[in-house]
Amino acid sequence: IIMIADMNCLKIINDEHGHDKGDEALFKLASYLKKHFGPIGECYRIGGDEFCVLAPDVSIEYFEEVCQCFRASLEAEDQETAYPFSASMGYVRLDESGIDECVKKADRKMYEEKRRKGRVRI
């Protein structure tokens, strides 16, 4: 499984609360990704506010359970911060189409979720 995660509202955090809070939010998101997905795969920051999780040896059902725990953690953190704290994620099963195509599919799914209403979208 490959997942692409993108922090929501980073520009708002930077503009309204300062870049130090934006950096803090990115660090928190990375920490939550590592906490939840680290035991089942590898987590990478691939761009400004974009992250990637590779979990090739886990079932989709278990991955979805981990996603729900991750989502609950982000929602709880959002209640505790003075700024909006959320992320959108998209994931796909790795297949024979190759890693590049799977990344594109996961990225498209993430952007579909980002367009929907709600704070933490998976």
Name each region found by the language model.
Residues 1, 8-38, 44-48, 52-53, ...:
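Conserved long alpha-helical elements within nucleotide-processing catalytic cores of c-di-GMP signaling
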Residues 4-6, 90:
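Residue-level recognition of well-ordered beta-strand positions that form the cores
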Residues 19, 64-71, 75, 92-122:
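Catalytic-core segments of nucleotide cyclases and related cyclic-nucleotide turnover enzymes
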Residues 35-40, 69-82:
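Short catalytic/binding micro-motifs of nucleotide second-messenger systems
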Residues 42, 58, 86:
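Ser/Thr-centric signal marking residues that sit
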Residues 45-46, 74-90, 118-121:
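Catalytic core regions of nucleotide second-messenger enzymes
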Residues 54-56, 92:
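Short hydrophobic/aromatic beta-strand micro-patches
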Residues 57-58, 97:
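Hydrophobic/aromatic docking surface of two-component receiver
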